[in-house]
Swiss-Prot record:
Family, similarity comment: Belongs to the prokaryotic/mitochondrial release factor family.
One MF annotation (Gene Ontology) recorded for this entry: translation release factor activity, codon specific
Name of the protein: Peptide chain release factor 1
Keywords in alphabetical order: Cytoplasm, Methylation, Protein biosynthesis
Record PTM N5-methylglutamine, positions in chain: Q237
GO cellular component: cytoplasm
Principal cellular location given in the protein's record: cytoplasm
Subcellular location: Cytoplasm
Gene3D superfamilies membership: 3.30.160.20, 3.30.70.1660, 6.10.140.1950
Keyword set includes Signal: no
Length: 363
C-alpha cells in the first residue's frame, strides 16, 4: 500500500476516535443538526476503519507466515507455506476494498432524481420508444423499492410519449441512474411497417439530482415568470375547471418548466420550483463534469447529453452500451426492468477511472 493512502486511512482512524467522543458530548446531543451530521459521519467512517483494522491484522499474520518460512523449523516452514497464498489473497482484496472506500463520494449520490425522456428522431416510433424507456426505468425503480411520480407528460399520437418528466424517490436513486443521461437509439420493425424493414429511432434521457434545498439555489424572484393554465389530459370532473397547472420561466437562462400533475396549484408550483432549481443546479454541475472529463479523458461521467450512449437492437435481442463496449443479448430482460446488468458495469468502470486518478494523485 502506498504511504499516501496509508496516511489518509490513519487520519480517518483518528477522526473516528474524535467523532466517538463528540457524539457522547451532552452539548452536541442537544444540537440536533450537529448530532445528525456527526452520526452520519460516524456511519460513513466506521466501515472504512473496520476494514483498515482487518488489513493491519492480516498484514501482521502475513509477516508471521513469512517469518515461519524463513525459520529453520521444517514444520513451521510448511505451515507458513500453506498459509501464505490465502493471506496474500486476503491482503490484496482488503487493499482494493480500502482504495474504493477512499474514492471521493458524489454528494448527490443519495439524492432523489428527476428523469426526463424526450422522443428524438423517428416520429411516432420515437415516442413509442420513449414510452418503453419510461416503463423500463419504472420497473427498475420497483425492483429497487423506489417511488415514481409523473410531473408532466405529453403523449404521442400512437402511444408512448413525446416528452415525460418524472420524479424518482428512493435511497441511492442518483448513484444508480446518473450514467443514463444521453441519446438512446432503438433499431426495430415498427408495428406500422408493412414491408418488415428495420427502422432506427432515438430518445434522449436526462437524469438530474433533485435539489436538496431549493432556497440554496440562488433564484431571484424577479428572474422568474410564472404562468398558470388549465391542466390537460385525464382527470374527470376536475379537468379544465381551474387554472391549477403551472409554468415557470427562468428568464436569464430561458429554462422553462411545467407541472400539471397535481390538482392543487400550490403543489404544482412547489414541484415546478424544485424541478427548476434542479435543472439550474444540474447545468452548473454538467459544465463542471465536462471540464473534469476533458482533463481525465473520462468515458462514463463525461456529462455530454448529446452523446449516443446505448443501442437497443430488437431483431438481435441486443443491448450495447457504447461507452464501455458492453454488449448483452438480454434485451427483453433489460426492458422489463433488469437494468442492473447495465448499471453495475458502468459503475465499476467509473470507479476504475476514479482509482486510476487516485493513483495518479498519490504518485
Amino acid at each position: 500500500m502506498k504511504e499516501s493512502i496509508r496516511s489518509k486511512l490513519e487520519n480517518l482512524v483518528e477522526r473516528l476516535d474524535e467523532v466517538n467522543h463528540l457524539i457522547s458530548d451532552p452539548e452536541i446531543i442537544n444540537n440536533q443538526n450537529k448530532f445528525r451530521n456527526l452520526t452520519k459521519e460516524h456511519s460513513q467512517l466506521t466501515p472504512v476503519v473496520e476494514t483498515f483494522n482487518q488489513f493491519i491484522q492480516n498484514q501482521g499474520d502475513l509477516q508471521e507466515a513469512k517469518d515461519m518460512i524463513k525459520s529453520g523449523d521444517p514444520d513451521l516452514k510448511e505451515m507458513g507455506q500453506e498459509e501464505l497464498p490465502e493471506l496474500e489473497k486476503q491482503q490484496a482484496t482488503l487493499e482494493a476494498e480500502l482504495q474504493k472506500m477512499l474514492l471521493p463520494k458524489d454528494p448527490n449520490d443519495d439524492a432523489n432524481i428527476f428523469l426526463e425522456i424526450r422522443a428524438g428522431t423517428g416520429g411516432d416510433e420515437a415516442a413509442i420508444f420513449a414510452g418503453d424507456l419510461f416503463r423500463m426505468y419504472s420497473r427498475y425503480a420497483e425492483t429497487m423499492r423506489w417511488q415514481v411520480e409523473v410531473i408532466n407528460s405529453q403523449e404521442g399520437e400512437h402511444g408512448g410519449y413525446k416528452e415525460i418528466i418524472a420524479r424518482i424517490i428512493g435511497d441511492g436513486a442518483y448513484s444508480r441512474l446518473k450514467f443514463e443521461s444521453g441519446a438512446h437509439r432503438v433499431q426495430r420493425v415498427p408495428a406500422t411497417e408493412t414491408q418488415g424493414r428495420v427502422h432506427t429511432s432515438a430518445a434522449t434521457v436526462v437524469i438530474m439530482p433533485e435539489a436538496q434545498d431549493v432556497e440554496q439555489i440562488d433564484l431571484n424572484p424577479a428572474d422568474l415568470k410564472v404562468d398558470t393554465f388549465r391542466a390537460s389530459g385525464a382527470g374527470g370532473q376536475h379537468v379544465n375547471k381551474t387554472d391549477s397547472a403551472i409554468r415557470i420561466t427562468h428568464i436569464p437562462t430561458g429554462t422553462v418548466v411545467e407541472c400539471q400533475d397535481e390538482r392543487s396549484q400550490h403543489k404544482n408550483r412547489a414541484r415546478a420550483m424544485s424541478l427548476l432549481a434542479s435543472r439550474i443546479m444540474d447545468e452548473r454541475q454538467r459544465i463542471h463534469d465536462q471540464e473534469i472529463a476533458q482533463e481525465r479523458k473520462s468515458l462514463v461521467g463525461s456529462g455530454d447529453r448529446s452523446e449516443r450512449i446505448r443501442t437497443y437492437n430488437y431483431p438481435q435481442g441486443r443491448v450495447t452500451d457504447h461507452r464501455i463496449n458492453l454488449t448483452l443479448y438480454k434485451l427483453d430482460e433489460i426492458m422489463q426492468g433488469g437494468l442492473q446488468q447495465v448499471v453495475d458495469p458502468l459503475i465499476n468502470e467509473y470507479q476504475a477511472e476514479q482509482l486510476a486518478a487516485l493513483s495518479e494523485d498519490s504518485a
